[in-house]
Design a protein with these regions (language model features):
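Conserved AMP-binding/adenylate-forming core of the ANL superfamily
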Residues: 5, 14, 22-68, 72-76, ...
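Conserved pre-ATP/AMP-binding loop-to-beta segment of ANL
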Residues: 21-22, 150-185, 192, 216-222
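Conserved AMP-binding A3 loop
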Residues: 35-37, 173, 181-207
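Structural core segment of the AMP-binding/adenylate-forming
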Residues: 53, 80, 84-158, 485
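Conserved AMP-binding/adenylation subdomain of ANL enzymes
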Residues: 204-222, 229-316, 325
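Gly/Ser/Thr-rich phosphate-binding loop
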Residues: 271-274, 284-372
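Conserved ATP-binding/catalytic segment of the ANL
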Residues: 387, 394-454
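Conserved C-terminal "lid"/linker of ANL adenylate-forming enzymes
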Residues: 452, 477, 482-488, 516-556
Length: 556
């Protein structure tokens, strides 16, 4: 592990804003664009409003909205003021949003109109202001001085900067290593959100990591932000890091369907692509799978020399479809389907799979695509150490544990969960099981909490079985559950594609059911799937597209 040297995150932002004053900073895809000077101006006005409202350093400010430029402005204004941003995923239900605003003790809420329609100020008595994020107009104010501050904000700004607002006027709050930077509520598959207390050292360490492994990125860089900015993965590597290097972030403000994503990538031509595996898997199934499974192509892919020519052509077309200008595609947030990964590996597509969690803000392991190994999620990231709680870490899986400046302070107002998060010697328990090879590459087996026990005590990780099932044509996604002593696969089929190929729902389900013996041939005897059940619609998911497993569990 390298020696970690802390740098103030807010001062890094201040320096970047000064250097890139006239460069583009934030855009809504096919919408408004702001230069760094525009962002700084909006931040300054919000700082003045915060002062007039007597918002103190360390006070909490909740932000609940879709990705957009003013989400970024609200977040940056809060943090550079010295207050604590509390990003809340816009897909949460109103009751959950009420709870998180109250639990975090937020004083101010930035929210968009659609979400606010389902909320009630009476259910959030600690708030003294609710702000419409699109326009920064007040939706609710508890005291007159807040209304006055909003009405006269431009006047106050003019008095503070009577001549002009210049880069040298910036003076952002100087943070310290163990100071609370933000509270980020998890959206995990267990159904209970915990407020992860992220310190500034964790943000700094992740920024240093990104600069170290991607030195090609700079103030000429374009990025398409398709992941929720309220989620740590998207926030850090599609937004916050980019702001410290003067890059240009393009927010997808609509639901990021594969069609919209591919359109945006083709137009923006980003220099780096950050994604969850499900997005890449959908692209593979819609654009590539049917081609490579054609009899003639399958045959040619087995012929030496010709196979490399075909693979090179497919890789070239895929790179072009993703904009043709990127260093690599970095995937994280969930397991990558093994069959699809093998295909990407064979065609030499520039991808890599990293590993992290909210509690590490988020990075734990990574390897550049030139240095990666098949099915591994890389080696310990800059400033980080990892270990496996196992008598033989190379052969016997154990819990993955990590240590370094990335790790969280704990869970907000939850001492019991915080205590469970750390080992006696201070390492963070990830709850994930894996092995590590002699060269330090990590291979994840699955979540400890999701693991089943086989008939003779064997460890069965449903994620590994689901990877096999998901590799079959017409399977969008699957979930393996324990069901009265056996294993049942819940499968969500691609009914739309089946229809295009001339199959109704019944025919498609029969086709998939007939493949159960083939599925079972690819998995160990002690983990055989007993039956398949079909989901009429997609699974309920977290914003990072993981299935909410707890909703589908049955009697064991």
């Amino acid at each position: 592990m390298n020696e970690f040297r802390f740098e103030s995150v807010n001062k890094l932002l201040e320096e970047s804003f000064r250097k890139n004053w006239d460069r583009l900073a934030l855009s809504n895809y096919q919408g408004v664009s702001l230069c760094y000077r525009d962002v700084a101006r909006r931040i300054e006005k919000l700082h003045i409003a915060f002062e007039k409202c007597f918002l103190h350093k360390g006070d909490k400010v909740a932000i609940c909205a879709r990705n957009q430029v003013n989400w970024a402005v609200s977040f940056l204004a809060t943090m550079t003021y010295g207050a604590v941003p509390v990003p809340i995923l816009h897909e949460f239900k109103p009751g959950n949003i009420h709870y998180l605003v109250n639990h975090s003790e937020a004083k101010v809420l930035f929210v968009d109109d659609v979400i606010w329609e389902g909320l009630s100020a009476d259910e959030m008595p600690g708030l003294f202001a609710v702000v419409r994020i699109n326009t920064f107009q007040l939706l609710y104010s508890k005291v007159p001085r807040i209304t006055e501050a909003r009405e006269h904000m431009n006047e106050y700004f003019g008095k503070r900067h009577p001549n002009s607002f210049e880069p040298e006027d910036l003076n952002y709050y100087k943070d310290s290593p163990n100071e609370l930077a933000m509270i980020n509520y998890t959206s995990g598959t267990s159904g209970f959100s915990k407020g992860v207390m992220i310190p500034y050292r964790a943000l700094c360490s992740n920024i240093q990591f990104a600069k170290h492994v991607l030195p090609e990125l700079n103030n000429q860089t374009n990025v398409v932000a398709m992941l929720p900015s309220a989620h740590m993965y998207g926030m850090m590597f599609e937004f916050l890091f980019e702001m410290t290097i003067g890059a240009h972030v393009h927010f997808l403000t609509r639901v990021p369907s594969p069609k919209i994503i591919m359109q945006a990538l083709a137009e923006v031509k980003p220099n780096i692509i950050i994604a969850v595996p499900l997005i890449i898997e959908k692209v593979y199934k819609s654009k590539i799978q049917k081609i490579v499974e054609k009899g003639s192509v399958k045959t040619l892919l087995k012929v030496p020399v010709i196979d490399k020519m075909i693979q090179k052509k497919i890789c070239g077309e895929l790179v072009s479809a993703f904009g043709g200008n990127f260093v690599e595609v970095i995937m994280g947030g969930a397991a990558f389907n093994k069959e699809i990964e093998k295909f990407f590996w064979d065609i030499a597509f520039p991808y890599t799979v990293g590993y992290g969690m909210t509690e590490c803000a988020p990075i734990i392991t990574y390897a550049h695509y030139d240095d990666k190994r098949l099915y591994s999620c890389g080696k310990a990231a800059l400033n980080i150490s990892i270990r496996i709680d196992s008598p033989d870490p190379e052969k016997i899986e154990g819990e993955i544990q990590t240590y370094g400046p990335n790790i969280a302070l704990g869970y907000y107002k939850n001492e019991e969960a915080t205590k469970d998060l750390f080992t006696e010697d201070g390492w963070l328990r990830t709850g994930d099981m894996g092995i590590i090879d002699k060269d330090g590459y990590l291979y994840i087996r699955g979540r400890y909490k999701c693991m089943f026990l086989g008939p003779n005590g064997q460890n069965i990780y449903p994620e590994e079985l689901e990877s096999v099932i998901n590799s079959f044509a017409y399977v969008v996604d699957s979930l393996v559950i324990e069901d009265n002593g056996g294993l049942t696969a819940l499968v969500y089929p691609d009914y739309h594609q089946g229809e295009l190929d001339g199959m109704n729902r019944e025919d498609l389900e029969k086709t998939l059911t007939s493949q159960l013996p083939e599925i079972n041939r690819e998995i160990p005897n002690y983990a055989k799937i007993k039956k398949i059940e079909f989901m009429p619609e997609d699974f309920e998911r977290t914003p990072k597209k993981s299935i909410k497993r707890y909703l589908y569990q049955r009697n064991k």
